[in-house]
Structure formats: C-alpha cells, structure tokens
C-alpha cells in the first residue's frame, strides 16, 4: 500500500510539473530571444557586472538538512547557469533530497533543460524502492544518459551548446554525487575537505583515450580545439561517431558517480559552477563557509556572500552555488561573532583615517587597495579582505555622505565626493 501511495504521489507530481513546464517553456523562449538581441562585446563581457542575486533556502526538519542557493550573472553578457533544489522527492520515503547546478555554454537552453527535467529522469530511474548504493549509482548514470537523449530529440540538428552538471542526491544513509564537466562539489567533514569531484578535462588519461578512440583530437587542451570539457549534456556535434554508444563518444553525457556513506562528522556540501571555483580553491571555500556558519549566517545569505567574494576576487563568469548543511555543520560561536564585530569596527576606523588624511576622500578602489596592502588580523579564512567588500563599501559610502553634507554647508557644495560601488569592489583590470 505504501508503494502504491508513493507511485500515485509521483504521478500527480509529474502532471503538475508538466503544466509548469509549459508555462516555463514560453518564458524560456522570450528569454532566449532577448539573449539573441543582446550586444556581443569582447569575450561577451559587460561594461559593469550584474551583481543582483535572489538567494533562497529551506530546511527539512526530520533529517536536520538545511540548504541555501544563489546565482549571479556577473560580467557575462548572458546568464547561462541554472540550478534546482528538492528537499523531498515524490514517491520516495522521507530523507531523500536532490540538488543540482548546471553551467551552460553556447547558450542557456541545455542548462535550463537539465534543471527542469533531470530530477524527473532521476526519479524514473530510481523507482519507488531504490537499492543502495550500487542501484542508485546506476540509476544516476542512466538518468544522465536518458536526459541527454531526450534533449537530443527536442533540439534541431543545427542547435549548438551544452552544459556541465553536478548533482547531489541525499538519502538517509548515503550522499551520491554525479557530475559531468567542470561544475564541482566539495564535502567538508570534521573540519577538512573529505571529498571533491574532479573536473572532466580532455587531458585526463581516461578522457583522452576515449576522445582518441572516437576519432577526435585534442588541441589547445580542448576537444577538437574548441570545447574545454570532455563530458556534458548537449554538445551533440561531438556525439556523432558512428557505431559507438553514447558513453564512448568524443564528449560523453555519462556522469562520474560517487557514493559516500554518511557520517556524523559530515558538515556541509558545496556545489558550484566554475565561475566560483576559478577564483577560490575547494579547501579555501570550505574554510570560508565554516567561518561564516560560526557567525550564524543563514545558508542562503552565505551563498550570496560567497558569490560577492568571488566577484571581488576577479571571477568573470556566471556564478551559481548551493550549500547543503548537515546536522554536523558548525554552529554559531559567541567568540567568532565577537571577533567579526571587532574586525568590522577596526575596518571602519581605518577607512575613516584614510578619508580624513586626504584633502578629499580617496576613491573606493584606492581605499580597498590600501587596505589590501596592510596586515589586517582576523580576516575571514579563504575569503580575506574580498569577503569584507560589502562592509567596506557601506562604511565608505557613509563617510562620503557625511563629507558631502559638510561640504554643502561650508562651501556651497565644494568638497562633494562621487563614491563608486565596489563592483564588486575593484574595477576590472585590463
């Protein structure tokens, strides 16, 4: 009876999702058309980054699972990342959840397709009573391949582009990670990185062997001199070697799947697109996340701060991250909060000194570079001064506002300043 109830729940869920997809499909066509009209600059970069984020999160009470997610377009002319979060999975017992980050290239359609349809393929392959762990690993492998085949059937033959993907499937006993390409996941356990996915690049021995066996070449570290990743959804022009199954094509949609037995020391899992990993290592990000959790920061706000930090560190790509916190995640610490407040106060005093020592307030970039050259204690591990960019910008803006008001009163507007946004804090260097 329980199995039948779960099957009915899944059927109802599928019907609801079909209606949602019809509406989303119309919205996607409008977004794609707007994207085609967007002006193309050098490397498809904007003149200023788009920093807007809509962080969101949730919690699953029975299993102690919390998550946060956020995304930012950054300097790119188009947003090609997508993600999805499921705290519960229809048709499966409590304690199962799914999270995915997808990073598109050559357009956003493949990533959006994956975010909307890959969970359904996973559910279909799992069935109502999945066997762990090998049955689930095989189900994830089949789900990626079936989703890729479905995408091929929907796309015109002239369509180009694809996406990388990293999926975290949580069960009460295991953490399953399935990934294609360079979207990455890191597990923190007992204060250290316990597991990290490895990017699928053409020069990895296994990838190189498959590419050459399928008649392909590797030039400039890229498949056929063009594609930087060797596994992806979509990219069907690289999947036409005759007589070879999908997993043995030049570019494969077959994921690498890991099954990690859950432990009480598990703290959190961070999933992110390469716009995040390009600027900060996995170990550094894990340290930064742990330090922010000790401040009591909600996972979704923490994700937003991570993306701001990566933007300030120089990321030029779209950025998406999902933080999944387990019961063993670091808890708020009064000492950590006290030290953070002291750091903010010290930064405020130093910025005031820098502005007061000049005839007119220096630019925000000058203030930031000056602070970066100084030895400031207790900066966030892994994030450094970049993690405090928002605080610095807010303090600077307040000081300039006071200076403006004083200038208006004293010299009829003389001495006004024109503060810039830390955009992320520093102008993009040529």
From Swiss-Prot:
Its cofactor is Mg(2+); Mn(2+). One of its GO terms (cellular component) is nucleus. Residues 16-65, 407-430 are annotated as: Disordered. Keywords: Hydrolase, Magnesium, Manganese, Metal-binding, Protein phosphatase. Coiled coil: none annotated. It catalyses: O-phospho-L-seryl-[protein] + H2O = L-seryl-[protein] + phosphate; O-phospho-L-threonyl-[protein] + H2O = L-threonyl-[protein] + phosphate. It is an enzyme of class 3 (hydrolase). Binds 2 magnesium or manganese ions per subunit. GO terms for biological process: positive regulation of canonical Wnt signaling pathway; regulation of canonical NF-kappaB signal transduction. Its EC number is 3.1.3.16. Transmembrane segments: none annotated. Residues 17-26 have a biased composition (Basic and acidic residues). Mn(2+) 1 binds at residues 103-104. This is Probable protein phosphatase 1N. The lineage of its organism: Eukaryota, Metazoa, Chordata, Craniata, Vertebrata. The gene is PPM1N.
